Structures are given as structure tokens and as C-alpha cells.
């Protein structure tokens, strides 16, 4: 049996393999809307947003664009990026790993929804420096995690799908270390399909 570390390395290939099927499965229902509205309430109108793990751009990026914002989306899957480019050709789409992507600009908001939690714990810790690098004062940051420290396996069309989380206390320490204040955090949000969501703002 493959160990979890090896499975974590398969995430990029799994999403490439199942990009179109995942898009159909995800659908257009925006169960995240309440969180996205709170996220957007923290930033100016017509802001530039960074979406890490953007997928095909639907439905989340679509909603952000509809609210008048400009988007740069990053995804490791070339298929996902091609779909996003086709869906929203006026936005900027970058095929890259969120852990190593290099962008010479900063953003009013950073989103890592259903993407950050596929990273192994050490990579998650290192991402907070990346979040800070792309931030300015008052940048909003929102990401999803697990409700507690640990690793878990899901399933995507028969392939094992790796997830990991740090503890809530460690996330709070890292956010504070990199200059973010927690605005709201809900574990296993029943109004958002059980997601554990963090919303913070750069000071």
C-alpha cells in the first residue's frame, strides 16, 4: 500500500487526470457564497485577487469576477488552466505549483479554497511565507483546512486523494507570525458542506 507521503505527491496528476470529470461533479452551485461575500467585504471594489488552486474558474472565480474584481488564477493542472482560460479569457491564468509560483505583484485578496489542504503539513507551514509575500496591508486571506491536525484520505473517481491539516492552534500561531489577524474561523461549517474555513486579514 502506498504511504500517505507518496499519495500526496500524486495530487497534481490526479487533478490533471480527472479535470473534466471533477468539473462536472463540482457543478455551479455556490455553497461558499456566504464566505465569499464576507471575504470580499474586507477589500476595496475592483481589487486584484489571487486564486491558488483555481481549477477551471467555475463557480468560484466566476463569482469573484462577477463582483467586479480582477483575477489571477494559479493551478498545477494544465487541463484546468486551459479550461479557465477558455471560460474567462480576459483574466490571467498561470499553470504553476502554488508552493513555488513566482508573481511580481501583490494582491488585495488571496484565496486557497479546497486546494491548500492537499499539501503535506510542512508545505502548509511554508505557505504562510508565500501568503505574506503576496500581501499588502489589509489583504484578505481565506483558505480551507481540516478541523484538527492529521492526514486523511478521500477518493476521486477511484484514486486516493490526500488531505492534511495542522491544528487550529498552529494555524493561529502561523497567521500571527506572518502578520495576519483571524477575522472568522468555523470548523465543520454545516452551512458550507462541512468545510473548515479560515478568514484572516494582513495587518
Tell me the role of every PLM-derived stretch.
Residues 138-145:
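Conserved beta-strand signature within the Rossmann-like core of class I S-adenosyl-L-methionine
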Residues 125-137:
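A short glycine-rich, Lys/Arg-flanked "PGG" loop and its adjoining helix->strand segment in the class I
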Residues 2-44:
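Conserved class I S-adenosyl-L-methionine
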Residues 44, 120-121, 135-137:
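Helix-to-beta-strand junctions that scaffold the AdoMet/dcAdoMet cofactor pocket
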Residues 187-203:
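Core SAM-dependent methyltransferase catalytic element
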Residues 153-170:
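Acceptor-substrate binding/catalytic loop of class I
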Residues 50, 56-100:
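Class I SAM-dependent methyltransferase SAM/SAH-binding core
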Residues 111-112:
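A conserved beta-strand element that flanks and buttresses the S-adenosyl-L-methionine
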